[in-house]
């Protein structure tokens, strides 16, 4: 989903979609899409709204730009532009016409997803995997091994649980990289009502 307003990133997100804010020399959304591709995902569905066309445009082919770079002999830059999206990956967009939250955004993609397995990626959080296997790749492997849905979480300070979706677990909190059964997600609970300090990433 890329339809949110990015209120935690204002004022920058007032005119630039938060997913397009740069991390070094590339927008955040590119890192997310490339991790999905490395995990074996070839069909990317962006759930967006009318103010986010810059995201759709970013993954579209820019024939005029490519022609100009080629004509000027800027081959290295042309290769980078073309590398934005591998040729065997498809990106499509569906619109979320009303801001009704993450669950609604995911449901907007249901007609396209059908009964196929899918991953929901939130492109506003960066996670350092510490040089190990990327988290999405590990989650895809676990899904195929166990046949059970996976959700990535990160421990947050108690004072900040009211800013995130917080998970309730069945049993103890697992060690990093391990899985545990989950019973619910509570959206932005009051500190005293939070079932844990594990936030959905």
Q: What is each model feature region?
A:
Residues 1-77, 91, 96, 132-138:
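N-terminal glycine-rich phosphate-binding loop and ensuing alpha1 helix
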Residues 5, 97, 154, 186-189:
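Short, well-ordered turn and helix-capping elements at secondary-structure junctions
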Residues 9-10, 128-130, 194-195:
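A generic structural signal for short coil/turn motifs at secondary-structure boundaries
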Residues 12-13, 120, 161-162, 197-198:
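Short glycine/proline-enriched turns and hinge-like loops at secondary-structure junctions
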Residues 22, 93-95, 151, 184-187:
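Structural signal for conserved beta-strand scaffold positions within catalytic alpha/beta enzyme cores
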Residues 28-31, 104-108, 184:
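Well-ordered alpha-helical segments embedded in enzymatic catalytic cores
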Residues 57, 64-68, 75-171, 175:
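Conserved beta-loop-beta/alpha segment of the NTase-like Rossmann-fold superfamily
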Residues 170-200:
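A short, charged helix-loop
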């Amino acid at each position: 989903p890329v339809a949110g307003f990015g209120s935690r990133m204002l004022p920058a997100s007032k005119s630039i979609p938060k997913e397009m804010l740069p991390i070094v020399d590339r927008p955040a959304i590119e890192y997310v899409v490339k991790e999905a591709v490395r995990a074996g995902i070839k069909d990317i569905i962006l759930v967006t709204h009318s103010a986010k066309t810059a995201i759709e445009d970013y993954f579209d082919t820019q024939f005029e730009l490519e022609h100009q770079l080629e004509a000027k002999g800027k081959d290295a830059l042309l290769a980078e532009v073309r590398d934005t999206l591998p040729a065997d990956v498809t990106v499509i967009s569906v619109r979320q016409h009303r801001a009704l939250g993450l669950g609604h955004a995911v449901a907007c993609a249901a007609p396209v997803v059908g009964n196929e397995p899918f991953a929901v990626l939130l492109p506003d959080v960066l996670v350092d995997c510490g040089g190990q296997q990327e988290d999405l790749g590990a989650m895809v492997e676990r899904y195929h091994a166990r046949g059970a849905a996976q959700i990535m979480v990160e421990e947050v300070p108690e004072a900040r649980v009211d800013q995130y979706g917080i998970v309730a677990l069945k049993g103890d909190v697992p060690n990093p990289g391990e899985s545990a059964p989950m019973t619910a997600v509570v959206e932005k609970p009051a500190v005293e009502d939070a079932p844990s300090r594990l936030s959905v990433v």
